[in-house]
Amino acid sequence: MHYERILLKLSGEALMGNRQYGIDPERLAEYAAEIKSVVDKGVEVAIVIGGGNIFRGVAGASRGMDRVQGDHMGMLATVINGLALQSALEDANIQTRLQSAIKINEVAEPFIRRKAIRHLEKGRVVIFGGGTGNPYFTTDSAAVLRAIEIKADVILKGTRVDGIYTSDPEKNKEATKFDFITFEDVIKKGLKVMDTTAFTLSQENELPIIVFDMNKPGNLLKVATGERVGTKVNL
């Protein structure tokens, strides 16, 4: 087993499947099966999920909404997604705990680092909702922060493309994929992996990031067990 403890970052949009908005139950079930395959191998799994399938604070601000208010709405969206994923995982017989960075005690535990680590040690999947609990920070930043706090070995960023390319492969067929790239080269080449705050935090704490296609069955297990899938970013 290559990694003992991973943090999986999923975007809210990933939960939409082929829909334009909201949550696709079939996609949720697929992701739950992928996560179960990793848990069954003894890997400790934490998850941070975005809220863009429901609401984005930045989008609200661009239409005149107060940015802080919008970000708070986005945080609540991540909790909704967390509850949906928790339900799907529990349907797959995986013990799961949802912790929130904002107090919402009726539906989620408050984020307590030691408690989160204890859940992981007991084989439970821990979903972190509510972002960082602060406006102006993305869920990418929340993912890196939580990964550092729980001492994860790696951040696995599940996307709809199979790694990092020289340019957007959905727009440029000539784009080529990197198997490995350094943090420094990502910055030099102006490649978009995460927002700058999240990426810098990961670099400073020497926390590797692997970007991979979450929608290809079996990929999560391959990445977690050390197979070369996607693009690895490290020092």
From Swiss-Prot:
Quaternary organization: Homohexamer.
Organism: Christiangramia forsetii (strain DSM 17595 / CGMCC 1.15422 / KT0803)
Top EC class for this record: transferase
Primary location: cytoplasm
GO biological process: 'de novo' CTP biosynthetic process; UDP biosynthetic process
Pfam families: AA_kinase
Name under which the protein is recorded: Uridylate kinase
Gene: pyrH
InterPro entries (alphabetical): AceGlu_kinase-like_sf (IPR036393), Asp/Glu/Uridylate_kinase (IPR001048), Uridylate_kinase (IPR011817), Uridylate_kinase_bac (IPR015963)
